[in-house]
A protein has these predicted regions:
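Structured-RNA-binding interfaces characteristic of tRNA pseudouridine synthases
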Residues: 3-216
């Protein structure tokens, strides 16, 4: 008998480097044997890069204490063919200092209703909690200065939240919004006032942080 648990779901088209899963089983196979067996069954784009036994109280989802996401914007004129699946091409002028100011305002505990996907009904939107805690944000140039990369670490995230955050930062960079408008969006709770939801392919879930004492 086997019971499964994953850290969480990513939006369709979003990549994951640090997805974590856990399961309970009555099998006597070692963790390494499970790793080899699973990799033999999975498609090449999905790999189990490590496996180990954990304590009975560990759950990949409920033991998670934070997640780190990264969104890559390619700023050059021509996207190299080896990376086009993993970046959003955005060669337009941007005020990156204003974007960094805006990104810093995400840090802390706020109501991210303006940055979340709709549940489909106004009643459901009002009932669900949209308060989230963001631990840190960073906006830096990488890749021979051709890429602008937004990294965010938080306790948990709403559906489409990171992609809406990036879209809003781009609106700040283009001068459509001011950095101080981030604070106003927390109060308004109106997703129509925030930036667009950027495409999923530039986003990757980099890491999931778990409690320290989960190893056997």
């Amino acid at each position: 008998m086997l019971f499964r648990s994953g850290t969480g779901r990513t939006d369709a088209g979003v990549h994951a480097l640090g997805q974590v899963g856990s399961f309970r089983t009555q099998s006597h196979l070692s963790a390494q044997d499970f790793q080899r067996a699973l990799n033999a069954l999975l498609p090449p784009a999905i790999r189990i890069v490590g496996a180990e036994e954990v304590g009975p109280d560990f759950n990949a989802r409920w033991s998670a204490r934070g997640k780190t996401y990264r969104y890559r914007l390619y700023r050059g004129r021509v996207v190299p063919p080896m990376i086009w699946r993993y970046v959003l091409h955005y060669p337009f002028p941007l005020d990156e200092d204003a974007m960094r100011d805006a990104a810093a305002r995400f840090v802390g505990t706020h109501d991210f209703a303006a940055f979340a996907a709709s549940t489909g009904t106004e009643e459901d939107d009002k009932e669900r909690s949209t308060e989230r805690e963001i631990y840190s944000t960073e906006l830096v140039r990488t890749g021979d200065n051709e890429e602008l990369v937004f990294t965010v670490c938080g306790r948990s995230f709403l559906r489409y939240m990171v992609r809406k955050m990036v879209g809003t930062l781009l609106d700040v960079g283009r001068g459509k919004l001011a950095p101080a408008d981030i604070d106003r969006l927390f109060e308004l709770r109106d997703r129509s006032k925030s930036g667009p939801t950027v495409p999923p392919h530039g986003l990757v879930m980099v890491e999931v942080q778990h409690e320290e004492a989960w190893h056997l």
